């Protein structure tokens, strides 16, 4: 009986140590930042020789390293992944996302948000941001919407989230008379804004943390009251909803 108990205890210890080892080596999923100025001139030359598309633009390359020590580069709509060694760099994969040309009259543009989003270990996505602005007498707005693209091993991309609210800031004139200016004490606009913070929770599950703020001028005739709100949404990346479940007034898309 004693032998049996000792054997069972050993099994429990082995199981526990295996669990601890798994916990130690299962690195948490982290969003990684592309940054400029991390490559030497020599390194940049070596990389550009392998993927000339990266260096056709005059913008400085943005780079990062993932936990497996592969090097990732971002330049405009071009993304590339390289193995690193003492002898240099070897191209592993590359992707091209076609970005819309900036239209000055429409005040709109697209860019890749300089972060690498983990879907699961060694499986990543990027966000393409559509941005536009509008202006009107005494006010205006800037709006950003995000679409997320998986970077597949084949070199292709797959869009799995489309046109989600990402950020906006808007102000609307509230003072129209001398009395308004006096009563508002210099605060002559209604202002509201929305921000988004994304946190990976586990493989194929992200949490979208929306934060909304409304600041109403004392001179406003909108009937609104100043307000701050938040909503945390768990998004299953296998079947993301068409749009996030946030209040309609938080989802400003422009006056149209």
Set out the residue ranges of the language-model regions.
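Structural signature of eukaryotic scaffold interfaces centered on beta-propeller domains
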Residues: 56-67, 108-121, 195-203
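Contiguous hydrophobic, core-forming segments of folded domains
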Residues: 115-152
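Bacterial N-terminal signal peptides that target proteins for export
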Residues: 1-12, 18-21
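Acidic, small-residue rich beta-repeat scaffolds with periodic aromatic anchors
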Residues: 26-54, 140-145, 151-256
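Residue-level detector of beta-propeller blades
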Residues: 60-63, 81, 91-93, 160, ...
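Acidic/hydrophobic-patterned starts of short beta strands in beta-sheet-rich repeat architectures
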Residues: 67-74, 119-132, 203-211
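N-terminal "first-domain core" detector
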Residues: 45-86
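Short N-terminal edge-element motif at the start of the domain
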Residues: 69-122, 134
């Amino acid at each position: 009986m004693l032998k049996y108990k000792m054997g069972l205890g050993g099994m429990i210890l082995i199981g526990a140590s295996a669990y601890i080892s798994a916990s130690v080596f299962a690195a948490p999923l982290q969003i990684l930042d592309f940054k400029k100025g991390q490559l030497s001139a020599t390194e940049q030359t070596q990389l550009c020789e392998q993927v000339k598309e990266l260096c056709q633009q005059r913008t400085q390359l943005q780079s990062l390293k993932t936990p497996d020590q592969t090097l990732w580069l971002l330049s405009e709509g071009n993304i590339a992944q390289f193995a690193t060694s003492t002898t240099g760099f070897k191209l592993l994969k590359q992707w091209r996302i076609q970005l819309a040309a900036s239209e000055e009259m429409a005040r709109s543009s697209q860019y890749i948000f300089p972060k690498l989003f983990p879907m699961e270990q060694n499986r990543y996505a990027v966000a393409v941001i559509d941005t536009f602005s509008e202006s009107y007498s005494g006010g205006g707005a800037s709006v950003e919407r995000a679409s997320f693209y998986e970077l597949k091993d084949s070199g292709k991309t797959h869009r799995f989230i489309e046109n989600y609210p990402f950020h906006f800031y808007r102000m609307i004139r509230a003072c129209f008379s001398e009395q308004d200016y006096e009563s508002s004490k210099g605060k002559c606009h209604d202002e509201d804004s929305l921000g988004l913070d994304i946190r990976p929770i586990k493989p194929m599950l992200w949490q979208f943390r929306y934060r909304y703020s409304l600041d109403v001028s004392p001179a406003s005739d909108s009937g609104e009251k100043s307000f701050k709100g938040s909503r945390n949404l768990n998004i299953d990346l296998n079947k993301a909803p068409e749009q996030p479940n946030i209040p309609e007034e938080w989802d400003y898309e422009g006056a149209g």
